[in-house]
């Protein structure tokens, strides 16, 4: 597969006989929602050196063992396969002892195994998983299946470890890292705008930047597979950074190992805070220093921190879909096998529909960028209907046309909420993106009488007032829903924790809207009379506004019980366009609309979102 992610849409179009849309439709035929094969992970092969006498000279033997499905107490190792500038390339000094008693030389570089074994021994970890040794690389089928589900190993491990190779060579570099990780370089400002500020001089900030830049130049930050490995470990990843033995270890260092051991999540969070603080006040005067700061931010960004403070550096992606950011960051890195990028993206984004590389090749699809675009769309990611023509690459198109007007109903777990916001049951056709859901129209404005401050402090009281008002508005089913919710009873269609969380957040948003004196709208399914939905008066919502909603349980697709895909949920204000074929409504996305609605499966209908102009050109 060709790595054409740097080619423009125009170039992609001119190099093929068929249109981009017809290519996307053809790629769709190579998609599958069947569950991934986890048989090779049921008993996970790991390496253990615990049976070796610690007084024995030389390197220990490594025993290939098997862990049960429930065992999570192992280290999952993330490292660069290829040669690195700062490491000895020798391997084979370690012996791997198989279950049969036969032995073979280890393929992983000796220096990597030296550091890993010393680290896990210091932490009391009995075994570790490393792909080059624990997956049969000669078995193409096993390797392919493992590739599609590699994320599960890193999610499962309690002790994921990233092995970097560029060493710290000066004491002040370690000192800078200590101050960074303890939050001594930048801090949050508790004002109504939500800002960060720098706590050190410009000259000290420049020294810290050089330390961060050195760490970011490690090849560990350049691989697509490693992006997945770190991303899927969530908050558990520890980084091993080599350092000169003469450097004095500080509080952040483990005295039992030669490496500097730091928390990857904390490092990203503090590095992002520091870089935003520096960029926002133009700390660095030289063009090179400003480039280095942006370079660090691109490679070590914290998505949560960037969402909170990105406005300070003119980052416009606050309400951009998470998958768009993830895809852009993956494509900044490299992969020796370009088609691996499809599995990496699917694993990181929790996609239920995957593309079969062999089928793509058989269908004559060679374009990685169009395969990524198809994967993005067929998994329900929302595109804006825009007449704006994109002259850039496929990634530029996704950034430009990806829906960016999400409005999460609560302050907590906003990125998780946005990650669930996807369309359901996608089918691509010449006219556009076909999906299923419910079409509502706002028919009645209701505003509850003002409540006392004591009443507003009690959410239960507010819910009771809402339920009473719904009863007087001929919305009996909604009234019953809110009364049941007060008793802890959720609607039956919420069969998964993900959708229950969404419902809780939406009810909370309605309660807060009532407390704030906002209008709320009762909505009816188009063609029906009874109000079955409430939406909050936000943005441009008015009487007569059309709202499209849909949901899909993660367990509506065939999959293994240990790795759930994400529930899908959308609630969008749309424009309905007149079309000759009235049986299939044509909708155009406008805004997000928070609210609660009661679906009836019999009323779900197919709709079509037309292709953006850039793809139709």
What kind of region is each of these model predictions?
Residues 254, 261-262, 266-484:
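Short helix/strand-capping turn motifs
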Residues 1-127, 134-145, 152, 157, ...:
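Metal-dependent phosphate/diphosphate-handling catalytic cores characterized by acidic Asp/Glu clusters
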Residues 80, 128, 219-220, 224, ...:
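Residues in intrinsically disordered, low-complexity segments of regulatory proteins
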Residues 4, 12-19, 149, 173, ...:
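Non-membrane alpha-helical secondary structure
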């Amino acid at each position: 597969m060709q790595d054409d992610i740097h080619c423009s849409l125009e170039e992609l179009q001119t190099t093929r006989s068929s249109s981009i849309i017809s290519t996307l439709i053809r790629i769709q035929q190579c998609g599958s929602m069947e569950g991934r094969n986890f048989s090779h992970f049921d008993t996970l092969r790991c390496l253990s050196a615990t049976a070796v006498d610690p007084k024995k000279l030389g390197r220990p033997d490594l025993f290939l063992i098997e862990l049960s499905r429930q065992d999570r107490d192992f280290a999952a190792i993330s490292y660069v396969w290829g040669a690195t500038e700062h490491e000895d390339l020798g391997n084979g000094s370690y012996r791997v002892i198989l279950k049969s008693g036969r032995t073979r030389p280890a393929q992983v570089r000796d220096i990597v195994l030296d550091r890993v074994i010393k680290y896990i021994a210091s932490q009391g970890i009995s075994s570790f998983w490393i792909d080059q040794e624990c997956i049969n690389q000669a078995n193409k089928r096993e390797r392919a299946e493992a590739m599609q589900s590699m994320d599960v190993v890193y999610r499962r491990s309690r002790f994921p470890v990233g092995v970097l190779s560029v060493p710290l060579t000066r004491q002040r570099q370690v000192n800078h890292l200590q101050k960074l990780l303890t939050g001594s370089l930048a801090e949050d400002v508790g004002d109504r705008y939500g800002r960060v500020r720098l706590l050190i001089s410009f000259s000290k900030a420049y020294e810290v930047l050089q330390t961060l830049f050195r760490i970011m130049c490690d090849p560990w930050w350049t691989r697509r597979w490693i992006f997945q490995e770190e991303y899927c470990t969530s908050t558990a990843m520890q980084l091993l950074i080599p350092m000169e033995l003469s450097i004095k270890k500080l509080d952040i260092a483990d005295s039992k190992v030669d490496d500097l051991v730091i928390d990857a999540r904390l490092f990203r969070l503090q590095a992002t805070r520091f870089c935003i603080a520096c960029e926002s006040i133009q700390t660095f005067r030289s063009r090179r220093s400003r480039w280095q700061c942006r370079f660090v931010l691109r490679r070590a960004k914290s998505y949560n921190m960037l969402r909170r403070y990105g406005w300070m550096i003119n980052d416009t992606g606050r309400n951009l879909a998470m998958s768009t950011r993830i895809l852009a960051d993956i494509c900044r890195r490299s992969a020796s096998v370009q088609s691996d990028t499809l599995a990496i993206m699917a694993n990181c984004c929790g996609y239920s529909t995957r593309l079969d590389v062999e089928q793509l090749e058989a269908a004559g699809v060679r374009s990685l960028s169009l395969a990524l675009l198809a994967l993005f769309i067929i998994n329900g990611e929302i595109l804006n209907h825009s007449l704006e023509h994109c002259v850039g690459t496929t990634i530029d198109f996704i950034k430009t046309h990806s829906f960016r007007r999400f409005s999460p109903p609560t302050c907590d777990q906003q990125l998780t909420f946005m990650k669930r916001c996807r369309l359901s049951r996608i089918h691509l056709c010449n006219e556009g993106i076909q999906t299923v859901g419910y079409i509502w129209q706002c028919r009645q404005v209701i505003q509850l009488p003002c409540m006392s401050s004591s009443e507003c402090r009690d959410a239960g009281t507010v819910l009771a007032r809402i339920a009473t008002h719904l009863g007087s508005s001929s919305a009996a089913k909604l009234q019953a829903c809110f009364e049941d919710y007060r008793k802890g009873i959720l609607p039956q269609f919420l069969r998964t924790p993900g959708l229950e969380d969404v419902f809780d957040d939406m009810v909370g948003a309605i309660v807060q809207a009532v407390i704030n004196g906002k209008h709320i709208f009762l909505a009816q399914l188009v063609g029906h009379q009874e109000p079955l939905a409430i939406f909050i008066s936000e943005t441009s919502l008015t009487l007569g506004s059309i709202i499209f909603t849909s949901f899909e349980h993660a367990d509506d697709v065939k999959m293994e019980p240990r790795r759930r895909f994400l529930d899908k949920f959308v609630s969008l204000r749309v424009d309905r366009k007149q079309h000759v074929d009235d049986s299939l409504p044509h909708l155009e996305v406008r805004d997000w609309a928070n609210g609660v609605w009661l679906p009836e499966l019999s009323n779900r209908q197919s709709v079509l979102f037309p292709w953006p102009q850039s793809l139709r050109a």
